[in-house]
Amino acid sequence: MNFKKLLALTFASLAMGNVASIAQITPIDQCNVKDMTMCGSDLYVATNEGYLIFDTKVGETKEMKTVGNLMSIIAKSETDLWYTVNLGMSSTINHVKGTETTTYSVANGAIKGGQYADVRARGLAYGPNNTVWFGAYGFFHKFDGKEWTNYTCPASNFGRINYKCFAFDSNGTVWVAGSDQQKNATFGEFDPVKGEQTPVACDFADDGVNSMFVDANDNVWIGTDKKGFYKYDGSTFVNYNKDSEANIDINIKTSATTGLCQAANGDIYYAFNKSLVCFSGDYMVVAGTVTNEDHPRDAITCLFPYGEYIFIGTSETGVHCYNTTTGEITQLADGTPVVSAISNVNTDKTKTSNATYDLSGRQTKNLLKGQIYIQNGQKFFNK
């Protein structure tokens, strides 16, 4: 980003009442990413200073808001978004609607449940019937457009549960997950009418849960801190980790996961340290790494899938974009467009042809051992 652009964004932020200085506004290629979401071609990036809106087609930061240490963000448009701000022993939940921002918290009486009800607020999610959900320390909350309803669930043997993951299936079932102070997980189905959670016994109960989503077949996928990831079909869990037969990559030496998600082609992705891992359903392999010799401690913090792309948030080098078709990783920066258009998965030749293609989309008949290829829309590893 050039200096004039940065200065203009700074004054715009100050004019809107955000106390900020140039030094406090970190560009998209250097920021500490906490969460991401997408609207059209605009990527919304939550950081420890506020949030950025980056146009991925043009390759330009459209807006910067220095509103504090964000933990979570969701958006329907540039003028309709939610974010949570961590204040230490409390949080605020903020709704931007048009030119107005409404703040909800225990301090202003909007969030009920006592002094801890908004601590560590995160996991913002849109639910059925235009509801908004978030989790906190010992509580999770639902907004129906007018007011918040807070739900208190039983504490574990090690204290309150910090709820941070929500997922919704096609039947409207609410799946919730979190961890207590000793990183013991809870996972289960929640009935918002009765206000009751039905816990599901799982073998990751002694681990932390950090991500969760529901696929098109209503399977629930859960990412854990150190036991790999799980697929739950409503009755049975299947675990995938570094010791699974599906792991054919010697570089996957840990079962830690971050940011479990699913790409448009059906592949599952997660991260550990600086590596992005792809699980095709048959195999696990490192799809790429985020490396920068000037930032040896950099690590992937979150993932966000968008069409054929996986956006990768990091702790020190901002956002990177992985193209699931070409296998290329590009660091986002002003002046670097990364999304030209979202490909229709039904018209991409690599997804409809019996021919074999490499990850760059080139047709090939000479298959090399140890490489990944595409045929009929499915990636496979040539042993």
Whereabouts are the PLM-identified features?
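C-terminal tail/sorting-segment detector
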Residues: 2-3, 374-383
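Sec/Tat signal peptide C-region and signal peptidase I cleavage site
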Residues: 18-23
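Short coil-to-beta transitions that initiate beta-strands within beta-rich domains
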Residues: 24-39, 63-78, 105-128, 152-170, ...
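Conserved beta-propeller blade signature
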Residues: 42-45, 81-83, 131-133, 173-176, ...
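Residue-level signature of beta-propeller blades and closely related beta-rich strand-turn architectures
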Residues: 49, 87, 138, 180-181, ...
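Short loop/turn segments that connect beta-strands within beta-propeller blades
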Residues: 55-59, 96-100, 143-147, 190-195, ...
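Structural motif
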Residues: 89-94, 182-188, 228-230, 277, ...
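Residue-level detector of functionally pivotal "anchor" positions at catalytic/ligand-binding pockets or at interdomain
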Residues: 325-362
